[in-house]
Amino acid sequence: MRVRACLAVLLISSAAAAPAAEPRLVLLGGGRAPEAALARFVQWAGGPRARILVLPWGGEDAREGFQAVKDALRPFAPGVVETAPPVPLRDDGRVELRRRLERATGVFLAGGDQQRLLDAFADDVVAAAVRARYRDGAAVAASSAGTAAVSSLAITGEGDFTVIDARQVAVRAGLGLLPGVILDQHFLKRQRENRLFALVIGHPRLLGVGIDEGAALLVRGDRHAEAVGGQVMAVDGSHRGELRVYLLNPGETFDLEKRKRGRAAERTPGR
């Protein structure tokens, strides 16, 4: 127990050594990722000097999942793309994860099975280390199940989605990288509106964001968001007795904090 506590301190403190940068997220809805979104991720991570750490823990074959991400990023020429140690992690694996995280300028949460990925992040030491590295300035990209895991309240994929009832939508604790937002993916393609509507009604303080297959949402500073490559839906349940639904087309922006659209000509800062 004492060893785990010490490792948690090491993982968090080592990631916090450098000055904090504005948080940057590239959230992919699954399927074929928009090239513009992958290019932005590599740019945010440092371009040719980028060192990307892939967490392929949601897939049945972690090596195959890692290779798929590496192949997708290759056209954008990051400096290094490496994989995380396999889960479940023991003490030596956590130390190795710390070593790879502290030198990473970008972290990629690959897709797969949401439950399997959330099982990996149920290790508090691992989850805290990823959060700390993100808050310390590493760009984070996530795809499919990885996108769902970014939420504080993460959709597991299980439940009865024929009704709009939050009690029928299974959720677990996620990473919480994007405060106040619950994320869904493969959204319009797989007709997942019911489960997101249900969770927003059940948790009106959370903004629901559904990212369609082939689309992405670029987010800076936990707030400034831009749809890329396809459609993104934002669902606001904070107004008593009604849901406000916003459909964002590629290039359109949204303020996640104010829960309002940006102007069509605006773009996410720091392009």
Protein language model features and the residues they cover:
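Bacterial N-terminal signal peptides that target proteins for export
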Residues: 1-7
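Hydrophobic h-region of N-terminal signal peptides that target proteins for export
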Residues: 10-19
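C-terminal and late-domain segments of enzyme folds
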Residues: 20-49, 59, 63-75, 154-156, ...
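Structural motif
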Residues: 27, 106-110, 141, 184
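Portal/gating segments that form or line small-molecule/metal binding sites
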Residues: 59-103, 109
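Catalytic-core regions built around general acid/base machinery
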Residues: 100-103, 123-137
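Catalytic nucleophile loop
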Residues: 109-111, 130-154
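Glycine/threonine-rich flexible loop motifs
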Residues: 114-124
